[in-house]
Amino acid sequence: MSYRVQVRVMPRGGLLDPQGQAVEHALSALGFPDASAVRVGRAIELEVAAESRREAEARVRQMCDKLLANPVTEDYLLEVGES
Amino acid sequence: MLTVAVVRFPGSNCDVDALRAVERVGVMAQFVWHRDTSLHGADIVILPGGFSYGDYLRSGAIARFSPVMQAVQRHAADGGPVLGICNGFQILCEAHLLPGALLRNAGLAFVSKPVDVVVERTATAFTSVFEPGVRLRLPVAHGDGRFVAAEDTLRMLEAEGRVVLRYVPATEESPLQPNPNGSANHIAGISNATGTVVGLMPHPERVADPLLGVPDGLGFFTSLAAWRPPVSTLSTPNP
Protein backbone atom coordinates (compact mmCIF):
# COMPACT_ATOMS: atom_id res chain seq x y z
CA MET A 1 0.00 0.00 0.00
CA SER A 2 1.03 3.53 -0.59
CA TYR A 3 -0.11 6.24 1.76
CA ARG A 4 -0.12 9.95 1.13
CA VAL A 5 1.01 11.78 4.25
CA GLN A 6 0.73 15.47 4.99
CA VAL A 7 3.13 16.79 7.59
CA ARG A 8 2.54 20.15 9.20
CA VAL A 9 5.60 21.54 10.96
CA MET A 10 5.03 24.57 13.19
CA PRO A 11 7.29 26.68 15.39
CA ARG A 12 6.76 25.61 18.97
CA GLY A 13 4.24 27.72 20.86
CA GLY A 14 5.93 30.30 23.06
CA LEU A 15 8.91 30.70 20.73
CA LEU A 16 9.18 34.05 18.99
CA ASP A 17 7.92 33.64 15.41
CA PRO A 18 9.13 36.79 13.60
CA GLN A 19 7.74 35.57 10.26
CA GLY A 20 4.28 35.18 11.77
CA GLN A 21 4.54 38.66 13.28
CA ALA A 22 5.61 40.19 9.97
CA VAL A 23 2.73 38.53 8.13
CA GLU A 24 0.32 39.73 10.81
CA HIS A 25 1.57 43.31 10.42
CA ALA A 26 1.22 43.06 6.65
CA LEU A 27 -2.31 41.71 6.94
CA SER A 28 -3.22 44.55 9.25
CA ALA A 29 -1.77 47.08 6.78
CA LEU A 30 -3.82 45.49 3.98
CA GLY A 31 -7.07 46.02 5.83
CA PHE A 32 -7.26 42.83 7.87
CA PRO A 33 -6.74 44.10 11.43
CA ASP A 34 -9.00 41.25 12.57
CA ALA A 35 -6.20 38.69 11.92
CA SER A 36 -4.20 37.82 15.02
CA ALA A 37 -1.87 35.17 16.42
CA VAL A 38 -0.43 34.49 12.95
CA ARG A 39 2.20 31.77 12.88
CA VAL A 40 4.16 30.58 9.87
CA GLY A 41 5.20 26.95 9.53
CA ARG A 42 5.88 24.49 6.76
CA ALA A 43 3.82 21.83 5.04
CA ILE A 44 5.47 18.72 3.60
CA GLU A 45 3.66 16.10 1.51
CA LEU A 46 5.05 12.68 0.80
CA GLU A 47 4.03 9.19 -0.21
CA VAL A 48 5.18 6.28 1.84
CA ALA A 49 4.91 2.56 1.08
CA ALA A 50 3.66 0.68 4.12
CA GLU A 51 1.58 -2.36 5.08
CA SER A 52 -0.90 -0.34 7.08
CA ARG A 53 -1.95 3.16 7.93
CA ARG A 54 -0.46 2.73 11.39
CA GLU A 55 2.89 1.63 9.94
CA ALA A 56 2.88 4.58 7.54
CA GLU A 57 2.29 6.98 10.39
CA ALA A 58 5.03 5.38 12.50
CA ARG A 59 7.51 5.66 9.63
CA VAL A 60 6.73 9.31 8.98
CA ARG A 61 7.03 10.05 12.71
CA GLN A 62 10.56 8.66 12.54
CA MET A 63 11.26 10.87 9.52
CA CYS A 64 9.98 13.89 11.42
CA ASP A 65 12.05 13.12 14.50
CA LYS A 66 15.20 12.62 12.41
CA LEU A 67 14.92 15.29 9.76
CA LEU A 68 11.62 16.93 8.87
CA ALA A 69 11.19 18.79 12.16
CA ASN A 70 13.71 20.12 14.65
CA PRO A 71 12.74 18.67 18.04
CA VAL A 72 14.28 21.68 19.81
CA THR A 73 12.08 24.30 18.18
CA GLU A 74 9.24 22.71 16.21
CA ASP A 75 6.16 20.56 16.65
CA TYR A 76 4.53 18.54 13.89
CA LEU A 77 1.14 17.07 13.00
CA LEU A 78 0.52 14.20 10.59
CA GLU A 79 -2.43 13.42 8.40
CA VAL A 80 -2.35 10.02 6.70
CA GLY A 81 -4.54 9.28 3.69
CA GLU A 82 -4.60 6.58 1.03
CA SER A 83 -3.05 7.59 -2.25
CA MET B 1 52.52 18.44 12.77
CA LEU B 2 48.91 19.60 13.09
CA THR B 3 46.65 19.53 10.08
CA VAL B 4 43.24 21.10 9.72
CA ALA B 5 40.38 19.92 7.50
CA VAL B 6 38.09 22.65 6.18
CA VAL B 7 34.90 20.89 5.08
CA ARG B 8 33.32 22.09 1.84
CA PHE B 9 29.61 21.59 1.40
CA PRO B 10 27.76 22.66 -1.72
CA GLY B 11 27.02 26.26 -0.79
CA SER B 12 29.95 26.84 1.57
CA ASN B 13 31.40 30.27 0.87
CA CYS B 14 33.77 31.04 3.75
CA ASP B 15 35.92 27.97 3.11
CA VAL B 16 38.83 29.81 1.47
CA ASP B 17 38.91 32.48 4.19
CA ALA B 18 38.99 29.76 6.85
CA LEU B 19 41.79 27.89 5.08
CA ARG B 20 43.86 31.08 4.73
CA ALA B 21 43.34 32.03 8.37
CA VAL B 22 44.67 28.61 9.40
CA GLU B 23 47.66 28.88 7.07
CA ARG B 24 48.38 32.36 8.41
CA VAL B 25 49.20 30.86 11.82
CA GLY B 26 51.52 28.31 10.23
CA VAL B 27 49.24 25.27 10.35
CA MET B 28 48.64 23.03 7.35
CA ALA B 29 45.08 23.03 6.08
CA GLN B 30 43.26 21.14 3.35
CA PHE B 31 39.76 21.11 1.95
CA VAL B 32 37.62 18.02 2.50
CA TRP B 33 34.62 17.52 0.23
CA HIS B 34 31.22 16.77 1.76
CA ARG B 35 31.08 13.38 0.03
CA ASP B 36 34.36 12.25 1.57
CA THR B 37 33.97 9.61 4.23
CA SER B 38 37.26 10.41 5.92
CA LEU B 39 38.99 13.53 7.23
CA HIS B 40 42.30 12.36 5.71
CA GLY B 41 44.01 12.29 9.07
CA ALA B 42 43.24 15.86 10.06
CA ASP B 43 43.63 16.73 13.75
CA ILE B 44 41.15 19.61 13.72
CA VAL B 45 37.99 20.24 11.67
CA ILE B 46 36.46 23.53 10.60
CA LEU B 47 32.90 23.70 9.27
CA PRO B 48 32.92 27.04 7.47
CA GLY B 49 30.17 29.54 6.86
CA GLY B 50 27.89 29.65 3.86
CA PHE B 51 24.56 28.24 2.81
CA SER B 52 25.12 24.49 2.69
CA TYR B 53 22.55 22.77 0.47
CA GLY B 54 20.85 26.12 -0.05
CA ASP B 55 19.69 26.11 3.59
CA TYR B 56 16.87 23.84 2.39
CA LEU B 57 14.45 22.67 5.08
CA ARG B 58 16.42 24.37 7.89
CA SER B 59 19.93 25.85 7.94
CA GLY B 60 22.33 22.95 8.43
CA ALA B 61 19.62 20.26 8.41
CA ILE B 62 20.70 18.55 5.19
CA ALA B 63 24.45 19.03 5.69
CA ARG B 64 24.15 17.10 8.91
CA PHE B 65 23.49 13.90 6.91
CA SER B 66 26.26 14.31 4.36
CA PRO B 67 28.85 11.50 4.34
CA VAL B 68 31.65 13.63 5.77
CA MET B 69 29.57 14.39 8.87
CA GLN B 70 29.82 10.74 9.94
CA ALA B 71 33.58 11.22 10.06
CA VAL B 72 33.15 14.55 11.89
CA GLN B 73 30.89 12.84 14.46
CA ARG B 74 33.53 10.15 15.09
CA HIS B 75 36.28 12.77 15.27
CA ALA B 76 34.30 14.77 17.85
CA ALA B 77 33.43 11.66 19.85
CA ASP B 78 37.17 10.87 20.03
CA GLY B 79 37.83 14.32 21.51
CA GLY B 80 38.99 15.95 18.26
CA PRO B 81 38.43 19.70 18.00
CA VAL B 82 35.68 20.98 15.70
CA LEU B 83 35.00 24.65 15.01
CA GLY B 84 31.71 25.58 13.35
CA ILE B 85 31.46 29.13 12.09
CA CYS B 86 28.03 30.58 11.22
CA ASN B 87 26.50 27.91 8.96
CA GLY B 88 29.00 25.53 10.59
CA PHE B 89 27.49 26.38 13.99
CA GLN B 90 24.02 25.68 12.58
CA ILE B 91 25.25 22.31 11.30
CA LEU B 92 26.77 21.43 14.70
CA CYS B 93 23.41 22.14 16.38
CA GLU B 94 21.48 20.10 13.81
CA ALA B 95 24.00 17.27 14.30
CA HIS B 96 23.46 17.45 18.08
CA LEU B 97 27.17 18.06 18.61
CA LEU B 98 26.06 21.26 20.32
CA PRO B 99 22.72 21.90 22.05
CA GLY B 100 20.04 24.34 20.93
CA ALA B 101 19.14 25.68 17.51
CA LEU B 102 19.63 28.81 15.40
CA LEU B 103 16.43 30.38 14.13
CA ARG B 104 15.51 33.30 11.90
CA ASN B 105 16.84 36.61 13.25
CA ALA B 106 14.29 38.34 15.45
CA GLY B 107 14.35 41.38 13.12
CA LEU B 108 13.88 39.08 10.08
CA ALA B 109 16.57 40.95 8.10
CA PHE B 110 19.84 39.36 7.12
CA VAL B 111 22.41 41.09 9.36
CA SER B 112 25.89 41.81 7.99
CA LYS B 113 27.99 44.11 10.17
CA PRO B 114 30.65 44.15 12.87
CA VAL B 115 29.44 43.40 16.40
CA ASP B 116 31.15 43.58 19.77
CA VAL B 117 31.44 40.34 21.68
CA VAL B 118 33.02 39.28 24.95
CA VAL B 119 35.11 36.12 25.14
CA GLU B 120 33.86 34.21 28.18
CA ARG B 121 35.09 30.62 28.02
CA THR B 122 38.78 30.40 27.24
CA ALA B 123 39.14 26.70 28.13
CA THR B 124 38.44 25.61 24.57
CA ALA B 125 40.57 24.46 21.66
CA PHE B 126 39.82 27.74 19.86
CA THR B 127 39.94 30.44 22.55
CA SER B 128 42.86 29.40 24.77
CA VAL B 129 45.03 32.43 23.94
CA PHE B 130 42.41 34.96 25.05
CA GLU B 131 42.06 36.52 28.47
CA PRO B 132 38.56 35.84 29.82
CA GLY B 133 36.41 38.94 29.43
CA VAL B 134 38.33 40.39 26.50
CA ARG B 135 36.18 42.31 24.05
CA LEU B 136 36.47 41.66 20.31
CA ARG B 137 34.90 43.28 17.26
CA LEU B 138 33.93 40.55 14.81
CA PRO B 139 31.74 40.58 11.70
CA VAL B 140 28.44 38.71 11.61
CA ALA B 141 26.60 37.84 8.39
CA HIS B 142 23.56 35.69 8.89
CA GLY B 143 19.82 35.39 8.51
CA ASP B 144 19.37 32.55 10.99
CA GLY B 145 21.46 33.49 14.00
CA ARG B 146 18.99 33.62 16.87
CA PHE B 147 20.22 31.04 19.35
CA VAL B 148 17.41 29.30 21.20
CA ALA B 149 17.42 26.38 23.61
CA ALA B 150 15.14 24.92 26.24
CA GLU B 151 15.23 26.76 29.59
CA ASP B 152 17.08 23.92 31.33
CA THR B 153 19.62 23.76 28.48
CA LEU B 154 20.29 27.49 28.81
CA ARG B 155 20.71 27.12 32.56
CA MET B 156 23.11 24.21 32.01
CA LEU B 157 25.19 26.19 29.47
CA GLU B 158 25.47 29.09 31.90
CA ALA B 159 26.13 26.95 34.96
CA GLU B 160 28.85 24.98 33.19
CA GLY B 161 30.42 28.13 31.75
CA ARG B 162 29.96 26.93 28.18
CA VAL B 163 29.16 30.31 26.65
CA VAL B 164 32.25 31.07 24.56
CA LEU B 165 31.16 34.39 23.04
CA ARG B 166 28.42 36.74 24.14
CA TYR B 167 27.18 39.84 22.36
CA VAL B 168 27.90 42.85 24.50
CA PRO B 169 24.75 43.34 26.58
CA ALA B 170 21.96 45.39 25.05
CA THR B 171 21.20 48.90 26.19
CA GLU B 172 17.78 50.38 26.88
CA GLU B 173 18.04 52.62 23.82
CA SER B 174 18.54 49.71 21.44
CA PRO B 175 17.19 46.45 22.84
CA LEU B 176 18.38 44.39 19.86
CA GLN B 177 21.74 46.11 19.48
CA PRO B 178 24.42 44.95 19.55
CA ASN B 179 22.77 41.54 19.94
CA PRO B 180 22.00 41.42 16.21
CA ASN B 181 19.50 38.59 16.15
CA GLY B 182 17.65 38.26 19.46
CA SER B 183 19.73 35.31 20.73
CA ALA B 184 18.79 33.95 24.13
CA ASN B 185 21.09 35.37 26.84
CA HIS B 186 22.91 37.30 24.05
CA ILE B 187 24.74 34.09 23.17
CA ALA B 188 27.04 34.35 20.14
CA GLY B 189 28.97 31.11 20.62
CA ILE B 190 28.98 27.99 22.78
CA SER B 191 31.06 24.88 23.32
CA ASN B 192 30.56 21.29 24.34
CA ALA B 193 31.40 20.29 27.91
CA THR B 194 35.06 19.58 27.18
CA GLY B 195 35.68 22.67 25.05
CA THR B 196 36.68 20.70 21.97
CA VAL B 197 33.56 21.48 19.90
CA VAL B 198 32.85 25.19 19.46
CA GLY B 199 30.16 26.97 17.43
CA LEU B 200 30.30 30.72 16.68
CA MET B 201 27.92 32.95 14.76
CA PRO B 202 30.55 35.72 14.19
CA HIS B 203 33.25 35.18 11.55
CA PRO B 204 36.77 35.34 13.04
CA GLU B 205 38.28 34.16 9.73
CA ARG B 206 37.20 37.42 8.11
CA VAL B 207 39.30 39.50 10.50
CA ALA B 208 42.38 37.34 10.80
CA ASP B 209 44.56 39.37 8.42
CA PRO B 210 46.18 42.64 9.63
CA LEU B 211 45.72 43.95 6.08
CA LEU B 212 41.99 44.14 6.79
CA GLY B 213 42.28 46.14 10.01
CA VAL B 214 42.52 45.03 13.62
CA PRO B 215 42.84 41.23 13.41
CA ASP B 216 40.49 40.48 16.31
CA GLY B 217 39.72 37.04 14.86
CA LEU B 218 43.31 35.83 14.72
CA GLY B 219 43.31 34.55 18.31
CA PHE B 220 40.89 31.76 17.43
CA PHE B 221 43.47 30.45 14.98
CA THR B 222 46.54 30.94 17.17
CA SER B 223 44.59 29.01 19.83
CA LEU B 224 43.97 26.25 17.31
CA ALA B 225 47.67 26.20 16.42
CA ALA B 226 48.57 25.80 20.09
CA TRP B 227 46.19 22.86 20.59
CA ARG B 228 47.80 19.48 21.22
CA PRO B 229 46.05 16.11 21.35
CA PRO B 230 45.97 14.49 24.79
CA VAL B 231 48.80 11.94 24.85
CA SER B 232 46.46 9.07 25.70
CA THR B 233 44.53 9.44 22.44
CA LEU B 234 47.59 9.24 20.20
CA SER B 235 46.98 6.05 18.23
CA THR B 236 49.96 6.14 15.89
CA PRO B 237 53.30 7.01 17.48
CA ASN B 238 55.47 9.33 15.43
CA PRO B 239 58.57 7.67 14.00
What are these regions (language model features)?
Chain B
Residues 52-53, 89-91, 147, 171:
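Glycine-rich nucleotide phosphate-binding loop and flanking beta-alpha elements
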Residues 73-77, 105-239:
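Amide-donor transfer/coupling interface in amidating biosynthetic enzymes
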Residues 1-84, 93-99, 103-110, 118, ...:
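N-terminal beta1-alpha1 cap of cysteine-dependent amidohydrolase-like domains
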